[in-house]
Amino acid sequence: MTNFSSSPPIAFGDLQGCHAAYRQLFDTLAPAADTPLWFAGDLVNRGPASLATLREIVALGERAIAVLGNHDLHLLAVAAGIRTLKPGDTIGEILDAPDADDLIEWVRHRPFAHFERGMLMVHAGLLPQWDAALALELADELQRALRAPNWRDTLRSLYGNDPNCWSPDLKHADRLRVAFNAFTRIRFCTPEGAMEFRANGGPAAAPAGYLPWFDAPGRKTADVTVVFGHWAALGLMLRENLVALDSGCVWGNRLSAVRLTDDPAARVVTQVACERCGAADE
């Protein structure tokens, strides 16, 4: 957590290397110098200016709170030799940059979750059995593991789909992998919280027996406001205790930011068009 500011944070959706759109949105918002800036993960990849985007967020210093997204972690995995570049990736310019080591270290030290003012920010989502305290405990375990000297081995062990549901009896890599996948990959789960990793359409395209993670009955984080990105097909969505921010900028749609006032009715959305930031089809 950062020092509390009197100014409500402004939360941005997935930038994914769309630097021009981010600059336009930032200039439109013209936030005061003491306004915290939250980023819901996926700062880089698929957009045309991943390096410039990452450098700009790093330059914000402690004012920027950015949680790790799946594309940010893909950058770490490629840098560590765990994964290879895929068609459509635009992170090569980061890896080739003279300040690559510093940038990778900055990304590696980002959190998986951030909690402040009764709001919990993650990249993708949460499992229904987790309350905010457990989510933060698991995020801390992941963060400490990725900041340790053997972080490459840890990161390698986190990739995989099993187990796909939470149990308090999970240990070691299995426990971390479930948390990793929920924080950075989830869209749909069963009412019991078993995750599904293939479907990426909107809620109406949920596979049989699955529903959006945030609609799981009895979700224990319903008592806090959850702020997240990741799900472009869902788009911008505001509920009293839910702020979904990924409005598909990298696919040529819009980049969104929301001023996270304590009163949900007072939250203001600002958007810019992203015609110049269209990624190739997956």
From Swiss-Prot:
Domain of life where this protein originates: Bacteria
Entry's Gene Ontology molecular function annotations: bis(5'-nucleosyl)-tetraphosphatase (symmetrical) activity
EC number per UniProt: 3.6.1.41
Enzyme class at the top of the EC tree: hydrolase
Keywords, sorted A to Z: Hydrolase
Gene3D superfamilies: 3.60.21.10
Family matches, as InterPro entries: ApaH, Calcineurin-like_PHP_ApaH, Metallo-depent_PP-like
Catalysed transformations (reactions): P(1),P(4)-bis(5'-adenosyl) tetraphosphate + H2O = 2 ADP + 2 H(+)
Database matches in HAMAP family: ApaH (MF_00199)
Family, as annotated: Belongs to the Ap4A hydrolase family.
Purpose: Hydrolyzes diadenosine 5',5'''-P1,P4-tetraphosphate to yield ADP.
Protein name: Bis(5'-nucleosyl)-tetraphosphatase, symmetrical
Species whose genome carries this gene: Burkholderia pseudomallei (strain 668)
High-level lineage: Bacteria, Pseudomonadati, Pseudomonadota, Betaproteobacteria, Burkholderiales
Gene (UniProt): apaH
